[in-house]
Amino acid sequence: MTPEENDLLCRVENGAPMGKLMRQHWVPACLSEEVAEADGTPIRIRALGDNLVAFRDSKGRLGVLDENCPHRRASLVLARNEECGLRCLYHGWKFDVDGNCLDMASEPPGTQMNDKIKARSYPAREAGGFVWVYMGDPATMPAFEPPAFAPTPDCRVSTLKIHIECNWAQVLEGQIDSAHSSSLHSSDMVPANVDAAKATDTTWLRPSTDKAPRMQCENTSYGFRYAAIRKPIHNADTHDYIRTTVYVAPFTCCLLYTSPSPRD
């Protein structure tokens, strides 16, 4: 891959083609629990190369705006979240969840200049414990439908958010690649005499010592899925241990583990 091809794949900011593609999708931007409190502290979001601010107003409505105030570019992460809007700490301009300028504390009483000012806002929805934002052209915005893999209220889930210094393609490649786990993660994915993949307090047990899985891949309407087929510790002549990886375009990966199963 040339440096130019690498940039074409990995860059998402400043109008890059891949960024334009991703902006046609609803993007998970933060956890709902990070903005759970009405009039709580705003949080910064870094999404597709842009800095945004998320907050929940006095009525519980969720807002996602460009981080910088349209007046003097002060950070709205430092704003006061009060009375149904973010009030910029610099000059007191106040914006609601739709980006409307509700008040200009630094302007003369009765001014109507605020009718001409608007902060850029982004449609936001909540589902599965996440805040999802749409950052593309409003004219082509798809209806929001929680993805099939998103947790539902009756699910017991543990959600972990990690900041990784890499581009989106690097981390996705690592998630999709099943073969590396036997070597790179050998200290925390331990072969063991168990019936199926099983988590403990410190390790992840799996019933296989096979470091060279066979791959079977299937293209789908949403991306692709493939099976990494390993020999299990027991019944290796008649059974397989399978880890299924599901890729959902453009940037989601789901891992599914199964018990050793008889071969058809």
PLM regions with names:
Residues 26, 99, 179-180:
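Secondary-structure boundary/capping signal
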Residues 11, 22, 117, 164-168:
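A structural signal for well-ordered alpha-helical scaffolds and beta->alpha junctions
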Residues 20-22, 47, 117, 126, ...:
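A generic structural signal for short, non-catalytic loop/turn and secondary-structure boundary residues
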Residues 30-157, 214, 234-246, 251-253:
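Rieske [2Fe-2S] iron-sulfur-binding domain
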Residues 260-264:
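A short, hydrophobic C-terminal helix/tail in secreted or cell-surface proteins
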